[in-house]
Amino acid sequence: MIFKLIIKPKGMGHYLKIRRKLKRKKPEFLRTNWYRKKAFRNDPKWRWGHGRDNKFRLKMKGKPRPPEPGYRSPRKVRGLLPNGLKPVIIHNVEELTKIKEGEIAVIHHAVGKRKRQQILEKAKELSIPIANPVL
């Protein structure tokens, strides 16, 4: 008897839910001695330990976990916003016309007030969603 394996294609919402669950469980990756030095406390980005006796590097019990590939989100939703749209950085009105369905505009931080206002008006005409519409 031959059994057929039926795989149903899962939608984007399914993978977004999985990513949300994984992110809840993911620890905050802190560098070595983050609690000792004020500079490390204020800028707690991950740095791998290089010392000979570094307990983080040796992955000793009781020490924080280092970042590993297992903590990554599903490939289909990697780089997407929580609403499932892909962010596209916009610098001017012309770039706004190149946005496709399934993408959301993000106005670049260096765009001034006047140009930002023009982009917002054009986006309203074309009914394109904008992630950071605040003036």
Swiss-Prot record:
Entry's Gene Ontology cellular component terms: cytosolic large ribosomal subunit
Region (Disordered): 51-77
Gene coding for it: rpl32e
Name of the protein this chain belongs to: Large ribosomal subunit protein eL32
InterPro entries listed in its UniProt record: Ribosomal_eL32, Ribosomal_eL32_arc, Ribosomal_eL32_sf
Family: Belongs to the eukaryotic ribosomal protein eL32 family.
UniProt key word Iron-sulfur: no
Covalent S-S links between cysteines: none
Any Gene Ontology biological process: translation
Molecular function per GO: structural constituent of ribosome
Keywords of this entry: Ribonucleoprotein, Ribosomal protein
Highest taxon above the source species: Archaea
